[in-house]
Every structure is written in structure tokens, then in C-alpha cells.
Curated annotation (Swiss-Prot):
Primary location class: cytoplasm
Cited function: Catalyzes the methylthiolation of an aspartic acid residue of ribosomal protein uS12.
Pfam families: Radical_SAM, TRAM_2, UPF0004
Binding site for [4Fe-4S] cluster 1: 11, 47, 80
Domain MTTase N-terminal: from-to ranges: 2-117
Annotated positions binding [4Fe-4S] cluster 2: 154, 158, 161
Taxonomic lineage from the root: Bacteria, Bacillati, Bacillota, Clostridia, Thermoanaerobacterales
Cofactor note: Binds 2 [4Fe-4S] clusters. One cluster is coordinated with 3 cysteines and an exchangeable S-adenosyl-L-methionine.
Official protein name in the record: Ribosomal protein uS12 methylthiotransferase RimO
Keyword Iron: yes
BP GO annotations: tRNA modification
Length: 436
């Protein structure tokens, strides 16, 4: 029995693809290992979204290729970098035995059979297909939460983004398939389902000819044993009144939304081809703020081609005024194959980094004030672990890996996956401390 390992880089959609590949291989009789040093076959599920992600993926391939001097026999690259650079990867990285694009990962077992016969395999170019339906998953997340992909690909045409080329056009999954998977995950012990897609709010537009996310949320919430539903990757132009009402009135949906806004200035939004403007964004924020205790996470991009000091100042004022609970700030990455690649003037790297730091400095104080307002109040916390004599976990305000944590002091015996109501005693810029 051969040992197979997988390293999953990039986004949560990649995580799900990795989990499906593991399930396919386990069913074929392969032994799954977490330690790459024990692997006979190693899969690297790459990210190719921005320059830093590409670099990380390539460095990982080169580093893992060194294991071929020892036990490792075959090295396979899958994911977005493979879809984007396919033939180039095989040519430039001789460590690789196979390259598989985003629409072909379900062929992983066949590919391994071919490389074991001495063939070098290249499979790509099918990013527009939705051909992984019904494949089981081996969860790589803790057993109490899981990501649930509701759609694949993207039909937005943001001028800075390569994703439509790497993941294909937007394809919603059928509601019955999503619900079946959600039920299976909850049966396995999952208490929090985190809904993801390139754009969760457009769910259903292609298949059902209308926005169906509110209905999907309603149906998922009927699953017994499910505690939290969390929504990531919402787009501002598709946040409807119906969706806001569903979030507001459905007890299982945490009052949290991740909604990448990218910028506040109309001219920058126009150059980004974001299909919205500042006024519409403000209306969406106002609608979301009508939900009691709502937490809004967003991301902004600084240093987009042509971003003037005036436009950046507008963004700074916007962040100060809107006081988002959670903010991520990225510097623009110039990517071949995007419209913005050819835009002028391109902003110097030093200016981009300076703007990123300025914006994060503003947000740091806002985040601290938000956290300070929780002191003395009670928060439900999902316990995730125990370290240095203290428990830690997440409240409804925190998505895994990207947000802060709540440290919980307790004499009681708690385990990962437990929900407790903690009294908050202290606050930091991104984390809270409580007692139970």
C-alpha cells in the first residue's frame, strides 16, 4: 500500500479540492499520511492568484522535490498554478511527474497510474466543467467545522483578477447536492458550516435564474445538529434585501459577513470594473448595519494602477467613517492576462506598502475599540484548543484562520468543539480574553 500526502496552498476552495482528492485516493486503497517525509506520492495543490502565492507554490514544489533523494517517488502539482502555467511548469520544474489543472483533479487516481508506468502527465483546460459532484471528502479541518462550496468559478470581470481564467465561469451547484453534502458533514460532527464560492451572493443566478442564497441558507438551517452557518466572499452588488432579512431572522446564521469591497473611490472602482460605486456600497453597508450585532469583514486593495493620493485619502476616510470590525489590506499585484496589467501608471512597490501600513494602522485602533466594547459582556465561544494553561476559540465574530481568537480562562474540562458562554474580561487589538 503506497503512502500519499497532500500539501494544500491558497484558498478554502483549494482545501475542498484537496479533501476530495484524498477521498478518491483512499477509496483506491492508498494510505493517507500527514508527514511528507513518509509519502511515496506527494500532491501540491497550488495557488496562482497573485505573485506572492505563485512564489510560495513554486518554492514548495522545489523544496518538496528534494525529498526524491529519499523515499518520495512521485511529485504532482494540481490547482490554479497548474491551470495557469501547465506546460511551463513541467518544462521548468523537472521535479514534477504530473501537472493537473483545476477542472481535472478528479482524475488524480488515473494520473498516478500513468506516472507509475513511466509517463509524464499533463491534464488541464477543463476549468469550466463542474465534474466533482458526488465525490466524498476527507476533512482536513477540525471535525467541528467545514467549508461548503456552493458554486465554482466566477463571471465577474474585475480588471485585476485572473480567477475566471483559472476557475472558469460561474457555476452554481444544485441546491439538493449542496444540502446532501451539508447533511453528511453535520452527521460527521460538523457544527459550523462556512459557505464559500468566488461570489456566494450570486448563487443560483445561472441555474435558477434568480438569487437563491437566502433560500439556500433557509434550507441549510433546517439541518438538526448544525449550530452556526457563516457566509464568506459576498459581493456588494448582490446583497439583496431578502438576504439581509434572512441573516437577520435566522438564528443559525452568525451575524457576520465577509464582503470584499476593494476600494471606496468611484474612479478606482471603475478602473477595477467592480460593477458598483461608493453610493451603492454605502447603501449595502447601511442595510447590513440594520442587523443587530452585525460584524462586517472586508478587504481593500491599495496601489491599484493610477491610484492617486486623493483617491487613497478617500479610502482612509471611508475606513475611519465606516468602522468595520474586520479589515484585510492587500497591495495590488500586477498579473499577466488581466486588464489592469496594461494600465498606467503602475504604483511603486514602496508606495503600495506604505499605503497598506497606513490603512492597517487606522484599522488597528478601530478594531481595538470594537473589542474594548465587548469587555464585561458575554459571548458564546467555540472552543478550539488549549495552550499554555488557557483555552482558545472563536466567537461568532471570527472566521477560522483570518480573524482573531478569544482566550478563555476556565477550571472546567473543555474540549475542541464545545460551545461555552464566556464573560469578556480583557481586550487586545485583535483578540479577546474571557472567563468561563
Amino acid at each position: 500500500m503506497k503512502n500519499v500526502g497532500i500539501i494544500s496552498l491558497g484558498c478554502h476552495k483549494n482545501t475542498i479540492d484537496s479533501e476530495k482528492m484524498l477521498a478518491i485516493l483512499k477509496e483506491k486503497g492508498y494510505n493517507i499520511v500527514n508527514d511528507e517525509n513518509k509519502a511515496d506520492i506527494l500532491i501540491i495543490n497550488t495557488c496562482g492568484f497573485i505573485e506572492d502565492a505563485k512564489r510560495e507554490s513554486i518554492e514548495c514544489i522545489i523544496e518538496m522535490g528534494k525529498l526524491k533523494k529519499h523515499r518520495l517517488k512521485y511529485l504532482i502539482a494540481t490547482g490554479c498554478l497548474s491551470e495557469r502555467y501547465n506546460k511551463e511548469l513541467l518544462k521548468e520544474l523537472p521535479e514534477l511527474d504530473a501537472v493537473i489543472g483545476t477542472g481535472d483533479f478528479h482524475k488524480i487516481a488515473e494520473v498516478i497510474e500513468k506516472i507509475e508506468k513511466g509517463k509524464t502527465v499533463l491534464e488541464y483546460g477543463h476549468a469550466n466543467l463542474l465534474n466533482d459532484e458526488g465525490i466524498q471528502r476527507i476533512l482536513t479541518t477540525p471535525n467541528y467545522y467545514a467549508y461548503l462550496k456552493i458554486a465554482e468559478g466566477c463571471s465577474n470581470a474585475c480588471s485585476f483578477c485572473i480567477i475566471p481564467r483559472l476557475r472558469g465561469r460561474y457555476r452554481s451547484r444544485k441546491m439538493e447536492d449542496i444540502l446532501r453534502e451539508a447533511e453528511e458533514l453535520v452527521k460527521k460532527g460538523v457544527k459550523e458550516l462556512i459557505l464559500i464560492a468566488q461570489d456566494t451572493t450570486k448563487y443560483g443566478v445561472d441555474v435558477y435564474k434568480k438569487f437563491m442564497l437566502p433560500q439556500l441558507l433557509k434550507e441549510i438551517s433546517k439541518i438538526d445538529g448544525l449550530k452556526w452557518i457563516r457566509l464568506l466572499y459576498a459581493y456588494p452588488d448582490s446583497v439583496t434585501e431578502e438576504l439581509v432579512e434572512e441573516i437577520k431572522n435566522n438564528e443559525k446564521i452568525v451575524k457576520y459577513i465577509d464582503i470584499p469591497l476593494q476600494h471606496s473611490h468611484d474612479e478606482v472602482l471603475k478602473r477595477m470594473n467592480r460593477n458598483t460605486n461608493k453610493q451603492k456600497i454605502e447603501e449595502v453597508i447601511s442595510r447590513l448595519r440594520s442587523i443587530p450585532y452585525m460584524v462586517i469583514r472586508t478587504t481593500f486593495m491599495v496601489g491599484f494602477p493610477g491610484e492617486t493620493e486623493e483617491e487613497f485619502e478617500d479610502l482612509k476616510q471611508f475606513v475611519k467613517e465606516k468602522r468595520f470590525e474586520r479589515v484585510g489590506v492587500f497591495t495590488y499585484s500586477r498579473e499577466e492576462g488581466t486588464k489592469s496589467y496594461y494600465m498606467k501608471p503602475q504604483i511603486k512597490k514602496s508606495v503600495k506598502i506604505k499605503r497598506q501600513q497606513e490603512l492597517m494602522e487606522i484599522q488597528k485602533e478601530i478594531s481595538y475599540q470594537h473589542n474594548l466594547s465587548k469587555v464585561g459582556k458575554q459571548l458564546e465561544v467555540l472552543i478550539e484548543g488549549f495552550e499554555d494553561g488557557i483555552y482558545y476559540g472563536r466567537s461568532y465574530m471570527d472566521a477560522p484562520e483570518i480573524d482573531g481568537v478569544v482566550y478563555v480562562k476556565s477550571d472546567k474540562k473543555l474540549k475542541a468543539g464545545d460551545f461555552v458562554v464566556a464573560t469578556i474580561t480583557d481586550a487586545y487589538e485583535y483578540d479577546l480574553v474571557g472567563e468561563y
